[in-house]
Amino acid sequence: MLLVDLFSQSNTLQTLTTNDNNDNLYSISTIEIPLKSSQPILTVSSNDIFVNEQTKRKNQLVLMNENLKKTFIESPIKEPIIGSLWYDKKQKLLLLTETKIFTYDLDTKIIKAIIDIKPTDDKIFKCFSMFNNECSLFIAYNEWGLKFIEKWDVNEDESWELMEKFPLNLGSNEFIGTILTINDNDNFNLAITIYNDFTEEWRMELRHLETGICFRSILLSRYDRENDYRMIYMKNMISDIKWLIYSKSSKKIIAINSKWKKTYFPYKFPIYRMELFQNNSVIIRTTKKINIHRFT
């Protein structure tokens, strides 16, 4: 496994060797796309890449197809966008702010707020997640000692309804960085990054979604309370690496393999967002550019 080469020398063609017994070789290339944003977002569908361009003069969404042709969409959203998801079943982009969730419809080109989803008890949204081809949205709040995440379902009339609250029961000195819902062979799990203020440590946990019981945990980093740790799940990739974890305060990526062993490797810039695209590319978003690392 030489996945380090994929990131450490992003301007050249590299060779990636998997840890299987066939000694297969894979070519790696990188495409750099300049695009500035003070608060970058990144989401992918099966064929498209969604990012934003937010500067003092511009506030717009940018849609790129698989050929990297750009379409610019002016955004009416005044609040900072803190998260985004691709809603595959309805072919819509979901955009999260601290108080609202918006949709962007690819057919109508309209951005509008989901009026049914409102923060409980005037809390502040932190992050959200969704299973592929599902009509359920999981939302977590930005607070210490978070006790649950909410599950919202969409009805036939396109209205949304709060259906369940799944337990988290964090300690009073803990908060989450992000959540990610995972479906492994019909096992529905929740991946979470958590900061503990007493130990001053970040950790990642895997929990059973319905019970909230943790069945896997790994320490990530210390002394970085101000910057959340995020993650992507490397399902169906050629490498043995299963998770990539990152923070915008660090130029190091934490890679976790199938045996839950960590490897640290450097990247040239602080990473704000990262996504897996079409099972053969890793896209990395910084404040100044989009790097698409593609291997075949």
Explain the meaning of each model-derived region:
Residues 3-37, 65-70, 258-259:
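A short helix->beta-strand "capping" segment at the edge of beta-propeller domains
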Residues 49-50, 92-93, 135-137, 188-190, ...:
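Hydrophobic beta-strand positions that form the internal "hydrophobic ladder"
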Residues 56-63, 99-105, 125-126, 135-136, ...:
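Structural motif
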Residues 192-206, 213-256:
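Loop/turn-rich, solvent-exposed surfaces of beta-rich toroidal or solenoidal domains
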Residues 34-46, 77-90, 117-134, 167-184, ...:
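Repeated scaffold domains used in trafficking and secretory/extracellular systems
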